[in-house]
Amino acid sequence: MAYLGEKIGKLGFGLMRLPKNGEIIDIEQTKEMVDLFMDAGFTYFDTAWAYEGSENAIRQALVERYPRESYQLATKNAAWINCKTKEEAVSQFDTSLRQTGAGYFDFYLLHNLGEGRSHFFDDF
């Protein structure tokens, strides 16, 4: 696959640890943070299937509120969790698409691949 020369800003919005209201992600505060980030001219958001609740949070705070072409969204395959077959990896990708509601990802990364797991992805 060829590099397409995608341009992204120098600062990305990571969604690993979001503000919480008790045990659940505070969506209203996350929306405010997303708005401040976008208003400052930044557009790259980074989430992951393994960041509990973050894909649903980005759907509510970004995807449902901004035109899809106005931001770049990356998520990750949690290679260390339940991805020993092509079917498991595809299932995790499909789950991420559904949870974010984004329609597509600008970037899809293999998260924490590690030497002991890379052969699974070489196989498929």
Regions found by a protein language model. Give the residues of each.
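N-terminal binding-site loop/beta-alpha segment at the start of enzyme catalytic domains
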Residues: M1-Y71, G103
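A short, structured active-site edge motif that brings together acidic residues
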Residues: E69-N82, Y108-H111
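Glycine/proline-rich, positively charged
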Residues: D35, C83-F124
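A sequence-level detector of short, solvent-exposed, charge-rich linear segments
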Residues: W49, N56-A57, N77, E115, ...
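Generic beta-strand or strand-like secondary-structure segments
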Residues: A57-Q60, K76, E88-T95
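Short alpha-helix boundary/capping motifs
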Residues: R65-Y66, A74-T75, F124
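Active-site mouth loops of central-metabolism enzymes
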Residues: M16-E28, K76-V90, G116-F120
